[in-house]
């Protein structure tokens, strides 16, 4: 797992929905600073937030974490 990959994915999907960091923060009941840290690859979202985050971004947790790409690369 790569925090920068996940952060870039969150940013990409957020922007594709024309959402701000504040929008994501409000949906997940976290601070804007937390979302900023995720997007910059400084932290991962808390495990309890992975599923709700993936649901609002309309992506699987595996895709959000880059796990599907890793398994494809290993084949």
List the model feature ranges, each with a label.
Residues 1-16:
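A short, Lys/Arg-rich alpha-helix, primarily the initiator
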Residues 2, 20, 31-34, 46, ...:
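Short coil turns linking two alpha-helices in DNA-binding domains
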């Amino acid at each position: 797992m790569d925090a920068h990959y996940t952060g870039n994915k969150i940013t990409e999907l957020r922007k594709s929905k024309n959402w701000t960091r504040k929008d994501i923060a409000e949906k997940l009941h976290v601070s804007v600073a937390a979302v900023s840290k995720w997007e910059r690859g400084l932290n991962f979202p808390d495990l309890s937030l992975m599923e709700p985050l993936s649901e609002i971004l309309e992506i699987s947790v595996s895709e959000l974490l880059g796990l599907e790409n890793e398994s494809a690369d290993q084949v």
